[in-house]
């Protein structure tokens, strides 16, 4: 549990503002003990479940060398949403890789892109 006098951690990701709201979530990169390591990605929330989990979709271009053209692809990533970050479906967010939190969740939402 987080005590009231404990300082807020800064994960060191550029262009991320630390949330003003304080949460008691142990899987929060700001107020808990979750460490962010690995890659950081940017995507749009397409589904937000009430169980502190969201589905983030990112679209990217893939070069097909046979036809010498680019094709659009998408990937859907499941991510944990801490209670101190207010997001809704359609918001553009930055997610960071962390340890596996469940069978399909290995990313955490770090903040909204404004």
From Swiss-Prot:
Belongs to the universal ribosomal protein uS17 family. It holds the Pfam family Ribosomal_S17. PROSITE patterns: RIBOSOMAL_S17 (PS00056). This is Small ribosomal subunit protein uS17. The keyword Ribosomal protein applies. Part of the 30S ribosomal subunit. One of the primary rRNA binding proteins, it binds specifically to the 5'-end of 16S ribosomal RNA. GO terms for biological process: translation. The gene is rps17. One of its GO terms (molecular function) is rRNA binding. Keywords: Ribonucleoprotein, Ribosomal protein, RNA-binding, rRNA-binding. It comes from the Archaea. GO terms for cellular component: cytosolic small ribosomal subunit. NCBIfam families: PRK08572.1, uS17_arch.
